[in-house]
A protein has these predicted regions:
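Conserved lysine of the Walker
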Residues: 58
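Hydrophobic positions on the alpha1 helix immediately C-terminal to the Walker A/P-loop
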Residues: 61
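N-terminal pre-Walker A segment at the start of P-loop NTPase domains
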Residues: 11-39
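Conserved phosphate-donor/acceptor-positioning beta-strand/loop module used by diverse small-molecule
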Residues: 154, 167-187
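The conserved Walker
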Residues: 53-54
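Phosphate-binding P-loop
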Residues: 38-45, 139-141
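Conserved substrate/cofactor phosphate-moiety recognition/catalytic segment
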Residues: 65-143, 157
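Conserved GTP-binding G-domain of TRAFAC-class P-loop NTPases and closely related GTPase folds
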Residues: 182-273
């Protein structure tokens, strides 16, 4: 099975809420092929974190920067980067349970039992979606495929931990911070498929803002801010910086060693192509 065919199959699987079982059925031999066939893929060993509060327009920004088709449930960009985002699985879970995402704020206030089922219980819809997405991410990591980690960034330690994990696998890391005013975020929230309460949105927005300086220190030169208060084309400066990062040779010594080993295996036909 070619890498292209495998990725296509995962795209189909990702549109299903039962993706966990599907991913667990992938054979080790196929994963080995991902390792050797993917070594020369675009975006290999590049990991870009998207951060920004609810309503900041991260999806719009990702679409603009990476050429991601917003109509796709699973996003595979022309850069070779694969989007890791639990929103699709979460929205599918809500739909399967007959829950209107636009009523989440109302449910949080009026139906604590249902809200626990959605967001708080160990087996909540949200936690199941996160678990599924984590499995998908692990699949990408096996082949060191390039990734866009799409999250809010309201918990600094989580980003810090995920960055360290990615770098331990050999990835070069980068962050695009999508910024907007609280007023605009609240306005956009009302037009989202999942409407959050003002209290939850305000807290998340504040947490993300408080982490801005920390993120700048954490990522150093591999950090760009996008002002998305008004939807507009991404600045050429940001676009160029991100493109250069993706296209540059892998800098991480662990990643360099992985590429050398995988390429040697591929050239020696140790694992059938």
């Amino acid at each position: 099975m070619s890498l292209k065919k495998l990725i296509t199959e995962v795209a189909v699987v990702d549109s299903m809420f039962d993706v966990e079982q599907e991913l667990m059925n992938i054979k080790e031999s196929i994963l080995e092929q991902v390792i050797v066939e993917g070594v020369d893929d675009p975006g290999i060993l590049k990991c870009i974190f998207m951060a920004g509060g609810p309503g900041s327009g991260k999806s719009f920004t990702a679409m603009e920067i990476f050429g991601i088709d917003k109509r796709l449930k699973t996003s595979f960009s022309h850069t070779g980067l694969k989007t890791v985002n639990s929103d699709s699985a979460f929205e599918k879970g809500l739909k399967d349970n007959g829950i209107d995402g636009k009523k989440l704020a109302q449910i949080e206030k009026e139906d604590p039992e249902l809200w626990d089922k959605i967001a708080n219980n160990d087996d909540s819809i949200r936690n199941k979606a996160k678990a599924i997405t984590q499995l998908q991410r692990k699949f990408y990591e096996v082949g060191r495929l390039g990734m866009i980690i799409d999250g809010t960034g309201h918990v600094y330690s989580k980003i810090q931990k995920n960055k360290k994990h990615a770098e331990s696998l050999g990835y070069d890391t980068y962050m695009v911070f999508v910024n907007t005013s609280l007023e605009v975020a609240k306005e956009r929230n009302q037009n989202r498929d999942r409407v959050l309460s003002d209290e939850l949105l305000t807290k998340s927005w504040g947490d993300v803002q408080n982490n801005l300086g920390k993120f700048q220190n954490l990522f150093g030169g591999n950090f760009r801010i996008v002002d998305n208060t008004v939807y507009k084309p991404i600045s050429g400066q940001v676009q160029k910086a991100v493109n250069n990062f993706v296209k540059k040779r892998v800098y991480n010594p662990i990643g360099k060693k992985w590429i050398s080993t995988a390429r040697a295996l591929k050239n020696a036909n140790i694992i059938k192509k």
